[in-house]
């Protein structure tokens, strides 16, 4: 059964998202009624995960455009509206430059508007409505793609991992959050875990806490508990011991991606690279799950990927309700200092895992593995789109 968790609620002209900063203690939906509200929600990490970021960004502008249409504030000239939408999309991209889905969506929207508005001579309202329809189709397509990723990934793990072949059911480790809270729904890497569970082939999912922002402890654990999937939380530094323990029978590590370069190098949440190195040493499959929109064929290798560095307070402080607050719906969230005053902090949000450490890249159209020379050929994934 698919996940009942819904993190993005959209009806034409209305967008609400779960404020992920308050999870897992408080489940609160906040309205996003403009591109500015979308930008701030992305920047503040009230929404995160490359696919969800792109969807919320585009839908936030769709809501804004429909409001302008309803208030008769849309210019008559389609060219003026096209320029306005493109300017707003560039602004939204600046909220999270590492997430290729967002920049990819912006480029596709510019191409759409060029074809529809400029070449077809659409009016301002027609241009706005063409954009809104594109945004809504993007939401539906992402959800369908995630279900495909889940099926392809689960099937590959069951056919290609030692632990799965030896024991029937399987245990999987994941990092950060790649589920309904990171996508339109169901998830990418977490979608694979969901599919294994739906097939009755998952013994247990392990999730890292994912410091410093604790997406695993706050978000992935929240989703796993919500879906009643057998799961165990570990700290990031326990991963090596988990993989080394033969009783745990970890079949694979499955992660998402913020950007995949043309050669397969993958930028993802900080700590992913460490897990890939551990997987290689312990001969455990390392699987990246991502829609094709996350693959950036213009970026040749991971060396070209810009790594966002975030503020030191994410490392030196932690936020949550006091343990004795009882009903968390009414709890007062507090920020606690956990590091020595004056200590210098380096806080890269992502790292890049070399393609050499990745066994498979799962997309909505299938699973890509390396050839006999150890090279991915990701361009083949786009042949059907040519």
Swiss-Prot record:
Purpose of the protein: Catalyzes the interconversion of methylthioribose-1-phosphate (MTR-1-P) into methylthioribulose-1-phosphate (MTRu-1-P).
Family statement: Belongs to the eIF-2B alpha/beta/delta subunits family. MtnA subfamily.
Keyword Cytoplasm appears in the UniProt entry: yes
Source organism of the structure: Uncinocarpus reesii (strain UAMH 1704)
Active site per UniProt: 258 (proton donor)
Catalytic activity: 5-(methylsulfanyl)-alpha-D-ribose 1-phosphate = 5-(methylsulfanyl)-D-ribulose 1-phosphate
EC id: 5.3.1.23
GO molecular function per UniProt: S-methyl-5-thioribose-1-phosphate isomerase activity
Protein's recorded name: Methylthioribose-1-phosphate isomerase
Known pathway: Amino-acid biosynthesis; L-methionine biosynthesis via salvage pathway; L-methionine from S-methyl-5-thio-alpha-D-ribose 1-phosphate: step 1/6
Entry keyword set: Amino-acid biosynthesis, Cytoplasm, Isomerase, Methionine biosynthesis, Nucleus
Cytoplasm in keyword set: yes
Cellular location(s): Cytoplasm; Nucleus
Any one GO cellular component localisation term in the record: cytoplasm
Positions bearing the site annotation: Transition state stabilizer: 176
InterPro entries attached to this UniProt entry: IF-2B-related (IPR000649), IF-M1Pi (IPR005251), IF_2B-like_C (IPR042529), Initiation_fac_2B_a/b/d (IPR011559), M1Pi_N (IPR027363), NagB/RpiA_transferase-like (IPR037171)
Root EC class: isomerase
One GO BP annotation of this record: L-methionine salvage from methylthioadenosine
């Amino acid at each position: 059964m698919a996940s009942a968790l819904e993190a993005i609620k959209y009806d034409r002209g209305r967008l609400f998202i779960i404020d992920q900063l308050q999870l897992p203690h408080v489940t609160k939906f906040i309205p996003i009624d403009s591109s500015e509200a979308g930008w701030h929600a992305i920047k503040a990490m009230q929404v995160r995960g490359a696919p969800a970021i792109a969807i919320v960004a585009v839908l936030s502008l769709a809501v804004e455009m429909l409001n302008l249409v309803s208030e008769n504030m849309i210019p008559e000239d389609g060219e003026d509206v096209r320029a306005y939408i493109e300017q707003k999309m560039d602004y939204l991209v600046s909220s999270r430059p590492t997430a290729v889905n967002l920049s990819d969506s912006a480029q596709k929207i510019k191409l759409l508007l060029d074809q529809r508005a400029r070449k077809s001579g659409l009016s301002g309202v027609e241009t706005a409505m063409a954009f809104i329809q594109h945004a809504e189709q993007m939401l539906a397509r992402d959800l369908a793609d995630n279900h495909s990723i889940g099926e392809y990934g689960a099937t590959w793990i069951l056919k290609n991992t030692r632990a799965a072949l030896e024991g029937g059911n399987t245990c999987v480790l994941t990092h950060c959050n790649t589920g309904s809270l990171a996508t339109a729904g169901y998830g990418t890497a977490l979608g694979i875990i969901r599919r294994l569970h739906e097939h009755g082939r998952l013994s247990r999912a392990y999730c890292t806490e994912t410091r410093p922002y604790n997406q695993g402890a706050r978000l992935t654990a929240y989703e796993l508990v919500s879906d009643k999937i057998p799961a165990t939380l570990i700290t990031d530094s326990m991963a090596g011991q988990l993989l080394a323990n033969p009783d745990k029978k970890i079949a694979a590590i499955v992660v998402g991606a913020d950007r995949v370069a043309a050669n397969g190098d993958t930028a993802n949440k900080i700590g992913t690279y460490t897990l890939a190195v551990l997987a290689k040493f312990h001969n455990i499959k390392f699987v990246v799950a991502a829609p094709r929109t996350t693959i950036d064929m213009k970026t040749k290798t991971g060396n070209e990927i810009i790594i966002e560095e975030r503020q030191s307070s994410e490392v030196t402080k932690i936020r949550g309700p006091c343990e004795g607050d009882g009903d968390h719906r009414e709890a007062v969230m507090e920020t606690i200092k956990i590091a020595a005053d004056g200590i210098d902090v380096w806080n890269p949000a992502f790292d890049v895992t070399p393609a050499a450490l990745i066994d498979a890249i799962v997309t909505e159209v299938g699973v890509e593995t390396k050839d006999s020379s150890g090279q991915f050929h990701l361009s083949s994934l786009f042949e059907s789109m040519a």
